[in-house]
Every structure is written in structure tokens, then in C-alpha cells.
């Protein structure tokens, strides 16, 4: 092709960023235009100069990874002949049909009365009713009846004690006839103390029953772990060394959305290498399913995927896909995977963005599934590790020390009708596709639409279809990370709170197993207990005010002979308070006793683990009222329809600034101070009972800030406080994750979108991975031209994120933008690109040197 335009002055700069030899660079430096340069690189004639950059994508891409891309047959062409990178396997669609929810029992009853039938369910090859009846189901039912008796019996006794503690004992003497003859004010003053006491007693019963459930769960978990005699544990179903059948293919899927890219792909690489070390890598494929809508992060993900595939030789085993339409959030992401590739796999392991799993753990999960044909989901108990802030280290210590008791206890009571936590679990693909697709909740408002907390619902649907849901609580090799500070944890809790409240709409859905109805209830109580506790404290304060400010009514009947005196039984109050403290803190003591018995070396020794437990208990006492108020706010926000978003500034060291702590905790501090002054004015002696609450609220700002500091967490680890075995003797997977995270951060891609537009190599990768591959059509061409013109007109600083996403998804528009930025010399884009390189202290030296086949001569 011919062109009389002068030689661009930036041609040499462009060539310097392509990895090739000096001879190749000198040969291409003679090109008159960028269109000619791209034509030479592509080794084929280009009729339209605007498409020249698109034509050279393949050559620019293979300059760095030619051998591996060709060996894995990763390069292909789309329907229009444009080069694309096969980042996903060929699509083989499977039907995924969610069943509509019928949450209104009145509507269901009316349909039954009127003879209307529901649409027939889809027919499947293997119906769940054909699964054999297992003995564990009968055993589980008996155990849960025992748990119910223990909880209710304990609550009734405690409620009886609580009733005796309250001062006003005369409900039976309140005469309804007398009330009708009094004024409203007289009636209110007479009835108010008893109404307050009744409300307090009701709330106390609910809260005590909730505490009792946790106590009995932890106690049975302690006995299970201490004796080691659990013939129903799922991990005993396999010997652990059976060869995995060739057809038992497993997909490891990692849904991500705007995550920390270096950490995500470090954990993925560590998991991949651990699976490879088992010799069973051919049974596994890895999928990164991205819902990222921040273009800089999306480009960084693409580069990180290419890097991890190149470094592990994982092309054809590690796949990457970014959705353009983010439907139904995480559950929709998994639905899309099941619809496109789910039929190719027998099992699926779901990973979180911070998950790491060992190869031994993953192969054991597959063997357990093979050995347990009626198991639909097997959930591991992830161990928290890898954090440095004081807050996170205390939390991961708590989950590592106390968590095993509760997970073992859950397994004891639930057996194969247990929890699924949404990650670090293996799922039988066929029943999951057939029965666990989630339809939106009907109606309008905050509790309608796409289900947020999908995991509990999927477990309930799996059990409804007749498949078991198990917790492999004793299976090692499963890891996760915790939020680094209190405010980040609360952001997560707000989403979980809304999701659990939504799930409760499914409590009465037809066919749900009673255990999973209870799971929905416990999910709600995890957050609803906070406002109940808050209202309990408020009503107690109101009762104190009534008792202090109002003259007691001693005679409730017209001809009552003896006065009714308010009663005080401090000995009963102390006994009940002591019992509650035992229920709350005995599980923690039992956890440490278990560690003493099993070996405390990995926790820093008996003395250090005991001191750490005491410090963690003090810290949990300080944080409990803070969480109570936040969770109360979250519950109210969900019912009032407030948006569940909380934008918090990014912090490299994960610490909480003082200004943010004041903003978030200031109202709590003020409430605590006012509450303390009110109680002191009413009755100073009562302040001792309320001191743990109000003092914690007044200290919330410094506690939140100080606990978020990394230096304090590292110092505590150096002194062997809050130490966990994964730090004392870290497994190879966690060592590799830390190493790869450090390496990834060293050369992490910054200003990704600008790089994808301007940089020769990044543009080639972005064009090859772009998924919006439309055929030639005039309306599409007009839109493309408008997008490119707009990007050049406003520059990178003013281009909106939505416009960036559209360009990043369209290989043609992105290629044209790249070509015009260089050929027309758009300095605003070029300067931003140069600045991003100069700001990177780890940028490679220029000109880039050739890699592999990049040293071959450039076709003329």
C-alpha cells in the first residue's frame, strides 16, 4: 500500500516498546506510516489503513509468548476473520432453567382450592427420589429434636429466673373492668411497667435461646474433636488414595469483581501448582470468571491471566472470561458458567477471590464425591490466614481456635443437611444445574429481585432435590482471608445482612427441608439479634426510668387488702448473669483446653495461647456493642430500602484513618456518653451493669483505629500472640501465595486502560481478548466511529468508565483508537501513557529485548 504522509516522529518510540532485536527494529524503522508498520508486522496486505492495527494484533501478541500460545493452540479467528485469543474453551451449552418462586402461602392455598396447578417441573434423567434412604438422616432428625429440647428447656428455666428478677409481679391483679373506668393516662401509667417487663421477658427469651443454640453447638463440637469418634463424618467415606476416574473432571471457578488483582492470581497460581504436584492436573480446569467493571482493573486482570498462564504453562488449563452483562451478580456469573461449560464437568469447586486450596484437599474432595453418590455439596472449613493488621490477626486467631468447635458441632447436629458458604466447596454439577438455578424473588422493594446471599438458597434447593449437603470439617488444606479492619468487615456484613433478610422470604417455600428453613432463620437471627439486643437494653433503661421517676402502684384492685410491693432479687440476677457469661465464654475456654490436649506449639505454647484468648475475649467485649449498633442500622436500612452501598477510601496498608473512624463511630460515641449520663442520673448503681456497653461505645473510635494498624499486628506475631499454626509452620500453598503476591505487586499494571489504548503489547492483548465481536453492519460502524472520535476529543482524563468499557469490549474500536492515537500524534493520550510508565519504578528498560520467536525476521 502507498501513502505519502511523512514518517511519524514517534515510530521509534513505538518500536522500542515491542520486544524485538535491533536488526528487526532497524528494518521496521524505514516504514513511512504506522499503517505500513502494522502491515509489515501482520505480513499481509491491509486494504483499509484504519484496520491496520487490528491486523497486526497477532504478531504483536506473539512477540512475547509465541511458543506457548502456538503449542496450546490458543490463537484463533472470529467469524469476521479477526484474530482472537482462546481464553475460554469452546461453548457447549446446557439448559439452565430457574424455577419461579412462590413465596406466598395464601396464593398457593388459593390455587389449590381453585384447582389451578403449577407448571410442571423440568424432567431430568436421574430423579432425586431414586437415591437410597440413608441412616444418617434418621440419626440427624433425632439429634436435632434433642437440640431443640435442650435449647427450649434451658430457655424456659432462664426465663423463669428472669421473671423472678423483674420488680413488678402483679399482672394477674390488673382488672380489665377497672381499666375501662379509668382515663387513658391512668391506664397507661398503671400498665406501663408490666408492658415493659413483658417485652423485656420476651426479648430475653429469644436472645437466650439464640445463645443456647451456639453453646450446645460448640459443646458437641468439643466432644466430637476431643474423642475423634464420629462415624458419620463425610471425610471417612474415602481411603484418600484411590485413583480419580478419568471422567471425573472438575472445574475450579473463581468469580471475581473489582478485586485485588495481584493477590487473586497469586492464590490461583499457588492452587494450580499444588494440584499439578499431585499428578492429577489433567482432571482439573481453572476458570477466572470476572464481573469487573473498572477498566483499569479489567486490563490488569487480562495481563495477570496471561502472565500466570505463561509462568505455569497453563494455557488450555487456566481460562479467563469477563462478562459484559453483569446479570444476577455472583450467582448469575456461576449460572453463565454452568450454561456455557457446566455440562463438560462432573464437579465444580467454587473459590473466592482470596481462596487458596491445596492439591491434596481438592483431590480428596473429588474422591469423597466419588465415594458418596448421594452427596450434592461438600463444604470444607476454610482456615483464615495471611493477614497482618491487629484486628485481622485477632479475628483469624478466633476463627482458628474457636471455629473448629462450631463447624464440628454444626456437622454433629446437621450431618448431610448442612450449610454451604459459597466458596471452598465442591458441588456435583448435574443436580446443581438442574435444581439450583436461582430465579429473582417476586415483587418490588428491597427484598425483591436477584438473590444476594445465594449460598444458603442453593444448599436448600440441593437438599430439596434429595441430595446431601455436608461439611468436611476435618479436611485440611482450605484457606481464606478476613477483612483487615472493623469497617471493612462491617461493609461485608451489610451485604450479608441484606441477603439473609431476603432469604427469609423463602422460609415457607414448598418443599424446603426443615433444617434449611432453620438455616434461613439462623441467618436472619445472625443480624436480627442485634436490634433485639439493642431494644432489650433500651427497654431495660426505660424500666429503670419508670421505677425511678414514677411512684409504684401498690393497689391494683379496688378492695385489695395487701399492697403489691416491687420485688428485687439481686442473688437471682447474679446467678442468671453468671449463667449467661458461662454460655457465652465457655466455648472459648473449651477451645483452648482442646488445644492444650492436642498440642499448643503451633499457637505459641500454652501460656501464649491462653493470654491470646483472654485478650481476644476482652476485644470481643469491646466490639460487641459496636457491632450491635451497626447491625441494627443495617437491618433498619434493609427494611427501609436504603441502598446497600458504602464507599470507603482505598488504603494500601489496610488501616483506618482517624477522620473515617470519627465519621463512622462518632454517633456511637455520642450515644454511649449520653446513655451513661442518663443512667447515672437515674440510678448510679445501675451504671455498673451497663458499663460494658457504654464504655465500649465511647471507646469505639480509638479501638477501631488502633486495631487496624499493621505494625501492632506484626509486633504481636513476633511475640507469638494470636499465633496460628499456618504462621508457625506455613503450608507450601500459603508460602507460594505470599511470594507470588509480592512478585505480582512488583510489576502490577497501573493505568490499565491507558496502556490498553496506547501500549503496543497491551493493546494487542486487549484486542485479542475483547468479546464484542459483531459482524460488519453500518449502524455498528457509526457507533464505533463516534466512540473513537469522542475518546480522542475528550482525552483519557475525561472519558467516562462506561465509555471505556465499551471500547475495551470492542476489538475493532480499540484497534482504531490505538492506530489514530499514534498516527495522529494525540499527545494527551501519549503523555498519559508515558507518565504511567515513568511512575512505575519496575518498568523494563527500553528498547525491549526479543523473547523466543520474537527474534525471527519480520516478513517484508
Swiss-Prot record:
Involved in the biosynthesis of osmoregulated periplasmic glucans (OPGs). Gene3D superfamilies: Spore Coat Polysaccharide Biosynthesis Protein SpsA, Chain A (3.90.550.10). One of its GO terms (biological process) is glucan biosynthetic process. It is found in: Cell inner membrane. It comes from Pseudomonas savastanoi pv. phaseolicola (strain 1448A / Race 6) (Pseudomonas syringae pv. phaseolicola (strain 1448A / Race 6)). It is an enzyme of class 2 (transferase). The keyword Membrane applies. One of its GO terms (cellular component) is plasma membrane. Pathway: Glycan metabolism; osmoregulated periplasmic glucan (OPG) biosynthesis. Pfam families: Glycos_transf_2. SUPFAM superfamilies: Nucleotide-diphospho-sugar transferases. It is a multi-pass membrane protein. Belongs to the glycosyltransferase 2 family. OpgH subfamily. This is Glucans biosynthesis glucosyltransferase H. It comes from the Bacteria. Its EC number is 2.4.1.-. The chain crosses the membrane at residues 146-166, 200-220, 519-539, 576-596, 610-630, 686-706. Keywords: Cell inner membrane, Cell membrane, Glycosyltransferase, Membrane, Transferase, Transmembrane, Transmembrane helix. One of its GO terms (molecular function) is hexosyltransferase activity.
Amino acid at each position: 500500500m502507498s501513502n505519502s504522509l511523512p514518517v511519524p516522529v514517534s515510530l521509534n518510540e513505538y518500536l522500542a516498546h515491542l520486544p524485538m532485536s535491533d536488526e528487526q527494529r532497524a528494518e521496521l524503522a524505514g516504514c513511512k506510516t504506522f499503517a505500513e508498520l502494522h502491515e509489515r508486522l501482520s505480513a499481509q496486505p491491509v486494504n483499509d489503513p484504519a484496520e491496520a492495527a487490528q491486523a497486526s494484533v497477532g504478531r504483536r501478541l506473539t512477540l512475547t509468548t509465541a511458543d506457548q500460545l502456538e503449542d496450546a493452540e490458543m490463537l484463533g479467528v472470529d467469524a469476521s476473520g479477526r484474530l482472537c485469543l482462546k481464553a475460554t474453551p469452546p461453548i457447549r451449552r446446557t439448559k439452565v432453567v430457574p424455577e419461579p418462586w412462590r413465596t406466598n402461602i395464601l396464593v398457593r392455598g388459593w390455587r389449590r382450592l381453585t384447582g389451578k396447578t403449577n407448571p410442571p417441573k423440568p424432567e431430568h434423567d436421574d430423579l432425586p427420589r431414586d437415591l437410597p434412604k440413608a441412616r444418617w438422616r434418621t440419626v440427624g432428625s433425632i439429634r436435632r429434636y434433642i437440640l431443640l429440647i435442650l435449647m427450649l428447656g434451658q430457655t424456659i428455666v432462664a426465663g423463669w429466673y428472669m421473671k423472678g428478677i423483674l420488680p413488678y409481679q402483679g399482672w394477674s391483679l390488673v382488672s380489665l373492668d377497672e381499666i375501662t373506668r379509668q382515663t387513658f393516662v391512668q391506664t397507661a401509667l398503671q400498665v406501663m411497667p408490666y408492658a415493659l417487663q413483658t417485652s423485656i421477658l420476651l426479648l430475653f427469651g429469644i436472645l437466650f435461646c439464640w445463645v443456647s443454640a451456639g453453646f450446645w453447638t460448640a459443646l458437641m463440637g468439643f466432644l466430637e474433636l476431643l474423642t475423634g469418634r464420629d462415624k458419620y463424618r463425610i471425610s471417612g467415606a474415602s481411603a484418600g488414595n484411590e485413583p480419580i476416574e478419568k471422567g471425573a473432571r472438575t472445574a475450579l471457578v473463581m468469580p471475581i469483581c473489582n478485586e485485588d488483582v495481584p493477590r487473586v492470581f497469586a492464590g490461583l497460581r499457588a492452587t494450580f501448582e499444588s494440584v499439578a504436584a499431585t499428578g492429577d492436573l489433567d482432571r482439573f480446569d481453572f476458570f477466572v470468571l470476572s464481573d469487573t467493571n473498572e477498566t483499569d482493573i479489567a486490563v490488569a486482570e487480562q495481563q495477570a491471566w496471561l502472565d500466570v498462564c505463561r509462568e505455569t504453562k497453563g494455557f488450555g488449563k487456566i481460562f479467563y472470561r469477563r462478562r459484559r452483562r453483569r446479570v444476577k451478580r455472583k450467582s448469575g456469573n456461576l449460572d453463565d458458567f454452568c450454561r456455557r461449560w457446566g455440562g463438560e464437568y462432573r464437579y465444580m469447586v467454587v473459590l473466592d477471590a482470596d481462596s487458596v486450596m491445596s492439591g491434596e484437599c481438592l483431590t480428596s474432595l473429588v474422591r469423597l464425591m466419588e465415594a458418596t453418590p448421594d452427596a450434592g455439596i461438600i463444604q470444607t472449613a476454610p482456615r483464615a490466614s495471611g493477614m497482618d493488621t491487629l484486628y485481622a490477626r485477632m479475628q483469624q486467631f478466633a476463627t482458628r481456635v474457636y471455629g473448629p468447635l462450631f463447624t464440628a458441632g454444626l456437622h454433629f447436629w446437621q450431618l448431610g443437611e448442612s450449610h454451604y458458604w459459597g466458596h471452598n466447596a465442591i458441588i456435583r454439577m448435574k443436580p446443581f444445574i438442574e435444581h439450583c438455578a436461582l430465579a429473582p424473588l417476586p415483587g418490588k422493594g428491597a427484598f425483591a429481585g436477584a438473590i444476594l446471599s445465594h449460598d444458603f438458597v442453593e444448599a436448600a434447593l440441593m437438599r430439596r432435590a434429595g441430595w446431601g449437603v455436608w461439611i468436611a470439617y476435618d479436611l485440611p488444606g482450605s484457606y481464606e482471608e478476613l477483612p483487615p479492619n472493623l469497617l471493612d468487615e462491617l461493609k461485608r456484613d451489610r451485604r450479608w445482612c441484606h441477603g439473609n433478610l431476603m432469604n427469609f422470604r423463602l422460609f415457607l417455600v414448598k418443599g424446603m427441608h426443615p433444617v434449611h428453613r432453620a438455616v434461613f432463620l439462623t441467618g436472619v437471627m445472625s443480624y436480627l439479634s442485634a436490634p433485639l439486643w439493642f431494644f432489650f437494653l433500651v427497654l431495660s433503661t426505660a424500666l429503670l426510668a419508670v421505677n425511678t421517676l414514677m411512684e409504684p402502684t401498690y393497689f391494683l384492685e379496688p378492695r385489695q387488702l395487701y399492697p403489691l410491693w416491687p420485688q428485687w432479687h439481686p442473688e437471682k440476677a447474679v446467678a442468671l448473669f453468671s449463667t449467661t457469661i458461662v454460655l457465652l465464654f465457655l466455648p472459648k475456654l473449651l477451645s483452648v483446653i482442646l488445644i492444650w490436649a492436642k498440642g499448643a506449639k503451633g499457637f505459641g505454647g500454652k501460656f501464649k495461647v491462653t493470654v491470646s484468648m483472654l485478650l481476644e475475649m476482652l476485644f470481643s467485649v469491646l466490639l460487641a456493642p459496636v457491632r450491635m449498633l451497626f447491625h441494627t442500622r443495617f437491618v433498619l436500612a434493609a427494611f427501609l430500602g436504603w441502598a446497600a452501598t458504602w464507599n470507603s477510601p482505598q488504603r494500601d496498608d489496610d488501616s483506618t484513618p482517624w477522620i473515617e473512624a470519627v465519621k463512622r463511630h462518632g454517633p456511637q460515641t455520642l450515644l454511649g456518653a449520653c446513655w451513661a449520663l442518663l443512667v447515672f442520673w437515674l440510678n448510679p448503681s445501675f451504671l455498673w451493669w451497663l458499663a460494658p456497653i457504654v464504655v465500649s461505645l465511647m471507646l469505639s473510635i480509638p479501638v477501631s483505629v488502633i486495631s487496624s494498624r499493621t505494625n501492632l499486628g506484626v509486633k504481636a506475631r513476633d511475640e507469638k500472640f494470636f499465633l496460628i499454626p499456618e504462621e508457625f509452620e506455613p503450608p507450601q500453598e500459603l508460602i507460594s501465595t505470599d511470594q507470588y503476591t509480592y512478585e505480582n505487586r512488583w510489576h502490577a499494571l497501573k493505568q490499565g486502560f491507558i496502556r490498553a489504548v496506547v501500549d503496543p503489547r497491551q493493546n494487542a492483548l486487549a484486542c485479542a481478548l475483547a468479546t464484542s465481536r459483531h459482524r460488519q453492519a453500518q449502524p455498528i460502524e457509526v457507533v464505533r466511529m463516534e466512540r473513537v472520535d469522542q475518546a480522542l476529543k475528550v482525552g483519557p482524563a475525561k472519558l467516562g468508565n462506561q465509555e471505556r468499557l465499551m471500547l475495551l469490549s470492542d476489538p475493532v474500536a480499540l484497534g482504531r483508537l490505538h492506530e489514530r492515537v499514534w498516527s495522529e500524534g494525540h499527545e494527551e493520550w501519549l503523555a498519559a501513557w508515558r507518565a504511567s510508565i515513568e511512575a512505575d519504578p519496575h518498568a523494563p528498560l527500553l528498547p525491549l529485548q526479543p523473547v523466543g520467536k520474537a527474534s525471527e525476521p519480520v516478513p517484508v
